[in-house]
A protein has these predicted regions:
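Nucleic-acid-processing active sites and adjacent nucleic-acid-binding tracks
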Residues: 2-58, 262-266
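Extended acidic low-complexity intrinsically disordered regions
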Residues: 220-224, 232, 236-266
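Short loop/turn segments at strand-loop or loop-helix junctions that form parts
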Residues: 1, 8-11, 62-63, 84-87
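C-terminal nuclease/phosphodiesterase catalytic domains that cleave nucleic-acid phosphodiester bonds
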Residues: 63-235, 239-240
Length: 266
């Protein structure tokens, strides 16, 4: 009866900020709620500097309302939109994409939609480890210093926090007596956690795990921020997905139901 979407921002050292969480009410078998979701692709969010930032990537979970989700991805025709499906285990956060669309002859279409598997255990373990981190005070006694991976959360209600922390990693024995680690739900509702997992996968697809200092400097340049002195090594152009995460001209913003808005946005 709804679609839930979280907007997360990521920075140096994989520091993260929950920007916004929306609950779009509506029957997923009907078009209205999907149209509301599509409107987010045209929106921008205001950086603290005043620059407008669009979504760099948009990951859509296809595990529920699968055919409707596929239809949404096809209709968007937007390279930022990626269909994803969570799997318990994997060697990498994002797996090799699988082609879904086929021709009448049964051959997979090269230009059809592809579904990326997401090893949810990797993202959840990283997230829960980062939630344990705390900020420190700089040497001047005034500046707040955040460690790599620190998770910034705005004012959120207890229900949202419980959803973020809805699972725990346990060890059980399989039928052969070998130990197996798996995630176990402690409560039924875990949409907030799922939204983070797929946002983290989207950030990885946009290049987060491969970013070097030069990439962050280029993003800062696009935002009009005065960064540290330039490196001696030349800055190379970054890929299209990263550029979409930089400064863009904003159109009229389509507003939706707001549940959370970060204090880091103006």
């Amino acid at each position: 009866d709804r679609i839930e979407a979280s907007v997360w921002a990521f920075g140096r050292g994989k520091e993260s900020w929950l920007v916004e969480h929306r609950v779009l009410m509506g029957d997923t078998a009907r078009d209205a709620v999907w149209k509301s979701l599509a409107e987010m692709l045209a929106e921008t969010w205001t950086h603290a500097s005043g620059a407008a930032m669009p979504l760099a990537r948009f990951a859509l979970d296809t595990g529920f309302a699968t055919q409707e989700a596929y239809a949404f991805v096809r209709a968007c025709r937007d390279s930022r939109v990626m269909a994803v499906k969570g799997v318990p285990r994997g060697a990498a956060l994002i797996g090799t994409p699988t082609a879904i669309d086929v021709s009448q002859g049964g051959k997979k279409l090269r230009r059809g939609i592809k579904v990326y598997t997401v090893a949810v255990s990797i993202a959840k373990l990283e997230f829960y480890n980062n939630l344990r981190k705390s900020a420190d005070v700089g040497e001047d006694g005034l500046t707040t210093v955040f460690p790599a991976g620190f998770v910034h959360l705005p004012k959120i209600d207890a229900e949202f926090i419980q959803q973020l922390c809805a699972e725990q990693l346990i060890t059980r024995r399989d039928r052969n007596g070998f130990p197996v680690r798996e995630w176990q739900k402690m409560r039924e509702r875990n949409e907030a956690l799922d939204c983070y997992v797929y946002a983290r996968a989207a950030a990885s697809a946009a290049g987060l795990d491969r970013f070097e200092e030069r990439h962050w400097r280029e993003l800062e340049r696009q935002l009009g921020l005065a960064g540290p002195p330039a490196l001696e090594t030349p800055t190379e152009s970054i890929n299209e997905a990263t550029q979409r995460g930089g400064l863009a001209v904003s159109g009229n913003r389509n507003t939706g139901r707001r549940v959370i808005k970060s204090r880091w946005l103006s």
